[in-house]
Amino acid sequence: MSEVQSPVPTESRLGRISNKILSLRGASYIVGALGLCALIAATTVTLNNNEQLIVAAVCVVIFFVVGRGKSRRTQIFLEVLSALVSLRYLTWRLTETLDFNTWIQGILGVILLMAELYALYMLFLSYFQTIQPLHRAPLPLPDNVDDWPTVDIFIPTYDEQLSIVRLTVLGALGIDWPPDKVNVYILDDGVRPEFEQFAKDCGALYIGRVDVDSAHAKAGNLNHAIKRTSGDYILILDCDHIPTRAFLQIAMGWMVADRKIALMQTPHHFYSPDPFQRNLAVGYRTPPEGNLFYGVIQDGNDFWDATFFCGSCAILRREAIESIGGFAVETVTEDAHTALRMQRRGWSTAYLRIPVASGLATERLTTHIGQRMRWARGMIQIFRVDNPMLGRGLKLGQRLCYLSAMTSFFFAIPRVIFLASPLAFLFAGQNIIAAAPLAVAAYALPHMFHSIATAAKVNKGWRYSFWSEVYETTMALFLVRVTIVTLLFPSKGKFNVTEKGGVLEEEEFDLGATYPNIIFATIMMGGLLIGLFELIVRFNQLDVIARNAYLLNCAWALISLIILFAAIAVGRETKQVRYNHRVEAHIPVTVYDAPAEGQPHTYYNATHGMTQDVSMGGVAVHIPLPDVTTGPVKKRIHAVLDGEEIDIPATMLRCTNGKAVFTWDNNDLDTERDIVRFVFGRADAWLQWNNYEDDRPLRSLWSLLLSIKALFRKKGKIMANSRPKKKPLALPVERREPTTIHSGQTQEGKISRAAS
């Protein structure tokens, strides 16, 4: 099975020529040598502004000519070109723009320079990290099923609703693997009776942990379970990540073939929209925030043998976990720290860019920010207590990839500095960049152009231009304190569980998640108005230097305002009235009349159709049936999934214009299993996760402006915090007898599977 790729655009003649040149024997060495010479020249050659403008124009032309190519060498060339232009900008900043008249100017100017150095450092690290994505393909398993390993599937849960967890458990029980070689465990922090009962009903195994208050949260839960299980491998699924049936068959091959691989990570795909997708006007046409990491960065990490463990949707070798004493408990991001510790011991990690599970995205901006605060705290903790640049066991590539991941969470402070810098002049008259507009055009604009344009080429449809700025700005003012406190006191902070599942019956504005940016934007607007007043009313009284400074800082303030307003727009929470998220799916089905009770099962009045979307609540089908608007009609829906037949009872609510809407008749556990299989378990369910157009920066900027416009529509009420209603527990189901294990009363020796 291979990943479905979007159609490759036809290359132009110039693109083919540039690819041929870069593919010639020895071309890579020539390009590398030329690039090194150019980088040296960038730090030594002095040019006046006019000469620099010519160089900048030539570099832009080179970008457009070479950028027509689609090869990997083309991308590397563009990254080297971008690095050259950025180093040229850095040289200019260090040598010609630090002419300060007062000590206040000096302090503010150095602060801005430090933020720029951080941004350039992250830019160069990202180029290194993604220079050669591995694009690993699945490996087949041994032909003899007897040679397949045993697997324990861990589903840890703390305070999540059973209605969410049960779908993951049923999906895991349906994974296509020899029944005597797989066990599914609910790891319950807190021993809740309804979870134990559900395990008995569905045939899963249950491990409850009573004393969880000071027991290292999720990492402690996993370590508690490791001591009570024995499978060769452990598949970890967050309690909302529902696997496809093919998960293990797709992802296990590399683990069996290479005994040095300790981890096989797969993408975290979400079937529900994140707050940015749901709340912004063009969000649904924009890739999810996490796609950049799972589509580009992790593939780059894999080349350097530096794939991170992301806490879920991953297979781990038990031997490797036991070799480091279990999951890391020193930080609140046990996943990345565990991978780092395994790699220090010589284990390899791997990444497969095929989504084989899907979960719920954070559904409210408040919870999204809270989750990112935990990630930032955890990665900074690792930076402090187990810095990848120190200690033994890691190769240089691994050190740099981990360093990039950890220091990327320092973004909050530089982001605030970039946004606020024009206020230094607009409010206090402190010009912290001593440069004429021509110099800015010659040095700064080319640096910005190449950074944005090269990122668009590298990221393609995984992340759109300017959206990283919006993501960071949304969270920056909340993360500043977390960053500083964790750097100074890495032991502070605790694990928090991300709340998921629920509805929002009315459109609301989340003031609690946006008030810092609202205050920030108000101050920025004040500064912009002052600058415009000076330019319009007092223009003739200003000297040339003052006019240039006001023009530069007003333009800067306007850019900051655009980003701030886009971040504020995310707080406009749109209605979410469905408990069950609909998923687009095109599945051939046969719809037929449900037989009366006691009657033989026959395909009476069978009609073929194609599903439009599916959910745990029902399905929409395009089907040539006469219009039905008078009431519910009992039907059955038949499909063939991955070579196996499935048949689900449903009620047709209506049929108009060839589209029929059904609700599932979900009255027993077996039916619920089939629905989970139909909606989430298909091997090809999520292969279109990257089905987004390639990035075009101007189009991306326009989409942000449309989102800002939508912020001011007259609808919705202001709220201090967003609390979605919880989904009620699912219907009671038939009972089945399993084995139950509680902390402190573990059955010694063996754990048997319940009858299914």
UniProtKB/Swiss-Prot annotation:
Catalytic subunit of cellulose synthase. It polymerizes uridine 5'-diphosphate glucose to cellulose. The thick cellulosic mats generated by this enzyme probably provide a specialized protective environment to the bacterium. Residues 740-756 have a biased composition (Polar residues). It is an enzyme of class 2 (transferase). Pfam families: Glyco_trans_2_3, PilZ. The keyword Kinase does not apply. Residues 319-379 are annotated as: Catalytic subdomain B. Its cofactor is Mg(2+). It is a multi-pass membrane protein. The active site is at 189, 335. It comes from Komagataeibacter sucrofermentans (strain ATCC 700178 / DSM 15973 / CECT 7291 / JCM 9730 / LMG 18788 / BPR 2001) (Acetobacter xylinus subsp. sucrofermentans). It is found in: Cell inner membrane. Residues 147-242 are annotated as: Catalytic subdomain A. Residues 576-681 form the PilZ domain. It catalyses: [(1->4)-beta-D-glucosyl](n) + UDP-alpha-D-glucose = [(1->4)-beta-D-glucosyl](n+1) + UDP + H(+). Belongs to the glycosyltransferase 2 family. Residues 721-756 are annotated as: Disordered. GO terms for biological process: cellulose biosynthetic process; UDP-alpha-D-glucose metabolic process. There are two conserved domains in the globular part of the catalytic subunit: the N-terminal domain (domain A) contains the conserved DXD motif and is possibly involved in catalysis and substrate binding. The C-terminal domain (domain B) contains the QXXRW motif and is present only in processive glycosyl transferases. It could be involved in the processivity function of the enzyme, possibly required for holding the growing glycan chain in the active site. Pathway: Glycan metabolism; bacterial cellulose biosynthesis. The gene is bcsA. Substrate binds at residues 238, 240. This is Cellulose synthase catalytic subunit [UDP-forming]. GO terms for cellular component: plasma membrane.
